[in-house]
Amino acid sequence: MVKKRINALIEQKKSFLCVGLDPDVQKIPTLFLRMQDPITEFTKSVVNATSDIAIAYKPNFAFYEALGLKGLHALDALIHHLPKNVVTIADAKRADIGNTSRLYATAFFETWGFDAVTVPPYMGYDSIEPFLSYKEKLTLILCLTSNSGSRDFEERRLEGGKLLYEAVLEKALEWNQFENIGLVVGANRAEELKRLRALAQGLCFLIPGVGAQGGSLEDSVRYGADANAQSALINIGRAVIYPDGEFSSIDDFEKAVAKKADEYVAAMRLALEQSAV
């Protein structure tokens, strides 16, 4: 079960770090752009620099699909390069009518071989069930996301007084018969994160929004982890994979990425110590 693997890795590495692998050709260092396959070499270098402290990697499919077959080949090369013991998350946000979702689930869990996938819940149970039928995988349901537009719908009050994201949590708990559901909750929503954790029992949280989106790392650790200081994946993308500076060699780049990742994990460990006091 993926959740057990996540918690074992948290315990082993003393880290909640999930690295967002979102290769943007406008931001990739020049030294990679001179190579035959810039995306593959860039993402491999990020993995090489972070694999000792990262517990998960989350490629966002849009960054690869936008490049057509070249991007999909790069994604395939990345998947084969990832260490076997880390957790892999397809950030694809796919769900549809049952038969289509069944094929999406097959694609992400079997064809691509991911451990987890992000899905929107708003088409209801029949759009989610095909993912949940993979009992050993993890389905991460969008609950309260980090973008400013989330207020347009996720914070709408429903009849009866519940907010939409609260109804999503309620359904996630109801559907979680195989203990293979997690939630996506933004790091920049500290009070809501705290409240959702109190209600969510032991559900695993994927927490984006730290760094470039302004979320607090300390709050993400304090409020996102469960009572056992587990069940949280704190995603950091741009702030780690695009360190400042010009790089004359892959080694220089990897050292800079490793330094940024180390700084974040050190801050996670400190926040964990402080929250335990």
Predicted regions: what is each one?
Residues 187-235, 239-240:
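A C-terminal functional module that forms or caps the active site or interfaces directly
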Residues 1-85, 252-269, 273:
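Conserved N-terminal beta1-alpha1 strand-loop-helix module at the mouth
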Residues 66-81, 97-101, 122-136, 188-198, ...:
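Active-site-adjacent beta->alpha loops and helix N-cap segments on the catalytic face
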Residues 10-12, 47-53, 76-84, 130-135, ...:
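Acidic (Asp/Glu)-rich catalytic clusters
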